């Protein structure tokens, strides 16, 4: 039982580390593309979105081991983030939204991906803490 818990802990740690790398790389790459004035920012974003989707699919196995309380907490945090994002969008300047519609869509997609990533990190971290507590008790 302890071996299984350690194995799951190792897998969760690996996923957590892999979640952090695409975020760092996509931010640096899209910043470079924006400063150069090239249209490669959308390609970079698409690549990072694909990476996040791959992490989502591989993470679903690990999330089965996490209690539904943690999942509910992550969902509530996601809903709060979405509400904050809607509030931020509603207070923005409407003329700037009309002038750069494509850029706003890309930014919104990127922020949604980051929100999902942060929620996954929260769920994984709480699962890791529970596993640590379990191993210390056992």
Curated annotation (Swiss-Prot):
<feature type="region of interest" description="Disordered">
    <location>
        <begin position="18"/>
        <end position="120"/>
    </location>
</feature>
<keyword id="KW-0325">Glycoprotein</keyword>
<feature type="compositionally biased region" description="Polar residues">
    <location>
        <begin position="18"/>
        <end position="52"/>
    </location>
</feature>
<dbReference type="GO" id="GO:0005576">
    <property type="term" value="C:extracellular region"/>
</dbReference>
<feature type="glycosylation site" description="N-linked (GlcNAc...) asparagine">
    <location>
        <position position="89"/>
    </location>
</feature>
<feature type="compositionally biased region" description="Acidic residues">
    <location>
        <begin position="56"/>
        <end position="67"/>
    </location>
</feature>
<feature type="compositionally biased region" description="Polar residues">
    <location>
        <begin position="88"/>
        <end position="104"/>
    </location>
</feature>
<protein>
    <recommendedName>
        <fullName>Mucin-like protein 2</fullName>
    </recommendedName>
</protein>
<keyword id="KW-0964">Secreted</keyword>
<feature type="signal peptide">
    <location>
        <begin position="1"/>
        <end position="19"/>
    </location>
</feature>
<keyword id="KW-0732">Signal</keyword>
């Amino acid at each position: 039982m302890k071996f299984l818990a350690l194995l799951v802990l190792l897998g969760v740690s690996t996923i957590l580390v892999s979640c952090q790398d695409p975020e760092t790389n996509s931010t640096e790459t899209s910043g470079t593309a924006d400063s150069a004035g090239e249209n490669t920012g959308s390609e970079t974003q698409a690549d990072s979105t694909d990476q996040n989707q791959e992490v989502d699919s591989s993470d679903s196995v690990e999330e089965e081991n996490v209690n539904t309380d943690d999942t509910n907490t992550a969902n509530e945090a996601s809903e709060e983030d979405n509400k904050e994002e809607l509030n931020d969008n509603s207070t923005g300047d409407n003329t700037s939204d009309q002038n750069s519609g494509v850029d706003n869509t890309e930014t919104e997609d990127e922020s949604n991906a980051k929100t999902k990533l942060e929620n996954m990190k929260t769920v994984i971290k709480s699962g890791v803490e529970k596993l640590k507590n379990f191993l210390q008790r056992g």
